């Protein structure tokens, strides 16, 4: 897909990856960009910068997503690309609030389902359309310190795979974005924390912290090639391959790696463990 002339909706667009994508799509000649986020003030600022429309939206509300899609289709005649990008990170295990898991499931998984349910009928009728869902490298690997994030991001990857397999013959293309860490204010604060939060932040930054512009460049290239996996940190492909080759070895290595992280003995950049049995990554607060 080439971005020029396209009608695009981006959720989670007030900052980070979403804002970076909006700005890049504008530079590449998108016809119309709708930027949606809970932060109404910031999302309208982004929309103003890209000459688009800013909308206050809760992605866990299916009625609201359907209404937005219907409005854009009525005004623009079509939606070419829906970027389901909203997300956040928290670090909790089994002892954590189960309500927090429910909320994260709503944002990281059900929001993608709601978007697909709303936008696919029109795309299928036209015989073309593109879904870009933001997950995380944690969806391919794991996130030490966060059960909630690990589980929901893995589910997001699985959903994207299902959508691509099920609807490709109807002209629908699907990509899933799986970055490690991307520079945001929230990520900066994570480094000042302790325990699982700090460990998770160190882990995510193992292969470098990218700017939102660098992530947007990787996305545009992947969309142009209609590539399913979008990996701004290319190292993740090798990590996932090693995990698939010998999962038991990977799990053993990850346990040792986790111990080192919590002990504070793993400096930034020293992430391959157990003779190349990998680390993982998490991403961005989208």
Residue ranges and their predicted role:
Residues 28, 141, 162-173:
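Active-site-adjacent segment of SDR/Rossmann-fold oxidoreductases
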Residues 116, 152:
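Active-site helix of classical SDR
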Residues 40-41, 57-67, 98:
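The beta1-alpha1 cofactor-binding region of Rossmann-like NAD(H)/NADP(H)-dependent oxidoreductases
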Residues 66, 88-102, 125, 145-148:
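Conserved mid-core segment of classical short-chain dehydrogenase/reductases
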Residues 2-33:
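Canonical Rossmann dinucleotide-binding motif of NAD(H)/NADP(H)-dependent dehydrogenases/reductases
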Residues 169-235:
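SDR active-site lid
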Residues 136:
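Residue(s) in the substrate-gating loop at a strand-loop-helix junction
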């Amino acid at each position: 897909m080439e971005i020029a002339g396209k009608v695009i909706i981006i959720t989670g667009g007030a900052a980070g990856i979403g804002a970076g994508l909006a700005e890049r799509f504008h530079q590449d000649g998108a016809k119309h960009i709708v930027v949606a986020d809970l932060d109404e003030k910031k999302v309208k600022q982004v929309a103003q910068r890209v000459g688009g429309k800013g909308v206050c939206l809760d992605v866990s509300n299916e009625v609201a997503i359907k209404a937005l899609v219907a409005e854009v289709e009525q005004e623009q005649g079509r939606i070419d690309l829906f970027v389901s990008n909203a997300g956040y990170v928290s670090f909790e295990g089994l002892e954590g609030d189960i309500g927090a898991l429910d909320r994260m499931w709503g944002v990281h998984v059900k929001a993608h389902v709601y978007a697909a349910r709303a936008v696919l009928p029109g795309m299928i009728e036209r015989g073309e359309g593109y879904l870009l869902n933001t997950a995380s490298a944690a969806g391919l690997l794991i996130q030490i310190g966060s059960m909630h994030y690990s589980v929901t991001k893995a589910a997001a990857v699985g959903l994207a795979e299902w959508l691509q397999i099920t609807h490709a013959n109807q002209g629908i293309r699907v990509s899933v974005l799986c970055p490690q860490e991307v520079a945001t204010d929230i990520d900066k604060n994570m480094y000042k924390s302790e325990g699982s939060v700090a460990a998770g932040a160190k882990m995510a930054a193992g292969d470098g912290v990218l700017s939102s512009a660098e992530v947007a460049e990787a996305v545009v290239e992947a969309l142009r090639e209609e590539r399913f996996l979008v990996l701004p940190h290319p190292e993740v492909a090798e990590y996932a391959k090693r995990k698939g080759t010998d999962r038991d070895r990977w799990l053993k290595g990850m346990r040792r790696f986790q111990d080192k992280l919590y002990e504070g003995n793993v400096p930034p950049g020293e992430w391959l463990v157990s003779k190349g049995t990998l680390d993982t990554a998490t991403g961005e607060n989208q």
